[in-house]
Each structure stands twice: as structure tokens, then as C-alpha cells.
Amino acid sequence: GPEVSSNFSGRPGSRAKGAALVRAEFIKAQDYARRVKASGNGNAPARDLKLETLARVLDGEIPALITAQRASEILTALRLQREFGFRLVLDGAAEAYLVLDEIREAGVPVIVHPTMARHGGTLENATLETVRILRDAGIPVALQSGFEGYVPKTRVVLFEAAMAAAYGMPFEQALATVTIDAARI
């Protein structure tokens, strides 16, 4: 979405193009990993740290954290996961409550962005009940504190847990979203 792509120069310009660029990078990483494996000890391709890391994602060694707010973005992330078989963690997921079955079926955990960020655009359909709805649906969920630039807003995380409790989540479960559940994800 625009919240993430605006942080990078040469940004894709559309969600479809962004997904196509991610797909292209995964394909490059697959090819790179095949060439490295085929080379054995000699004639290996030039080292590429980005492709090495993406190959580790595709091998399931590390999860991919994909920011997706709208239901359509979430479904795109799930399609990429199915296509390439990597471990996925959804980040943001403001409209996750609209695609619960798909998220649950994929076995994907969700890290929900702070409720205090109530902008328009991709967050216009966000609800303060998302965390409870996800938890009630059996989807692993955690809350994040958000950040300002590169500075985490750690003071916000307890507020977010309190908001989850205020909107129907039992206290112990709300506390778990910022402690043990977050650690498990």
C-alpha cells in the first residue's frame, strides 16, 4: 500500500504493479538459489545479499512480513504465499475482518497496526474490533506500537491492548497480544 511504498524511491505506483514487482523479485531469488546450488564449489554467481535473503524467505527459513491493509492487498499477499510457499506474516491488515476465512485457511498470523492511526485511504475501513475478531476466528494476532520514522512508539502498546479489551477482548487475551502472542509470531 501507499504507506509503505512511499518510503522508497521509484515506488511502483499501483498495487498491481507492486505485487508484480514482488513476484519478479521472488522469481529472481528462485533462479539465484538454483544457480548457487548448481554451481557447487565453483563458478557460483556473484553474491547478492538481497536475493540470498529472499531465497531464505522462499525456503521457509525466515518469514516474509508483508504490509497489506485492504482486503484486496491481503488476498494478493495470500496468493503470493500460495504461489511461492513462503511463511507469511500479515502486517497492518485493517480489513482482515473481511477475509477471515482466507487468512485462517492460509494459517497466517497477523500483526495489527495501532488504532490511533485513523487516516483515510487504506485505513478508512479499519475497525477497533479487528484484534478481537481475528482472535475469535482462531487467527494468531499481535498488536504493534507503530513508529515515527525509525523510533518505535513503545508507549502506545499498552494503550492498544487496552483498546482491544475495551472493544470486547478479555483482558488476559488483550495482554497476550502485546506479550506472548507477539513473541510467538
What are these regions (language model features)?
Residues 65-70, 87-96, 115-120:
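Catalytic beta/alpha-barrel core
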Residues 63, 104, 109-185:
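His/Asp/Glu-enriched, well-ordered alpha-helical/loop segment
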Residues 1-88:
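Polyanionic/metal-chelating signatures
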Residues 71-75, 93-100, 149-151:
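Active-site environment of divalent metal-dependent phosphoester hydrolases
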Residues 83, 87-91, 108-111:
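Long, well-ordered mid-to-C-terminal structural blocks that present hydrophobic/aromatic surfaces
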Residues 46-49, 69-72, 95, 122-126, ...:
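Short secondary-structure boundary/capping elements
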Residues 11, 43, 66-69, 91-92, ...:
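Glycine- and other small-residue-rich loops at beta-strand/loop junctions that grip anionic moieties
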Residues 53, 98-99, 130:
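Short acidic active-site motifs
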